Amino acid sequence: MKTKIILWISSLLLLTAGAGCEKNKDYEVPTQLTGTRWELAGIVDAKTGKITPLAPKGSYWFKFISETEAKGGTVLNQMTVYLTTPPFFVINTKIGDEENGDAALFYRIIKTLESYTWEKNELKFFYDNKQYYLLYKYSKS
């Protein structure tokens, strides 16, 4: 009987210890930028945290080809992103997609970017004295 109690307590302790080691995150965190893909979640109001997505969803993305340069696209155009100070977005093609979704708003914002941060699975591109930012989320695809 004593052996069963000790075995039961040991099992309970191991089970509890194993649960304590469980990672408590529902996303993957990249350790480097090269090779990672990022999708725009939306425009964030830094004071309230409210996210306003840009239409059409999934149309504003990029993938890093080095630690400071990424290639991607908007609704119809191709773009290059440079992580400099300030960050710099270049629209490589000039197909008129200003009428598609929120592309015109996106183009106005990227001309005024001031700084960026990379924290875990988020890239934030700040503008308007850091009152707002473009929030990009790491994408596994």
Predicted regions and their residues:
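Sec-dependent bacterial lipoprotein signal peptides
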Residues: M1-A19
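Lipid interaction determinants
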Residues: C21-S141
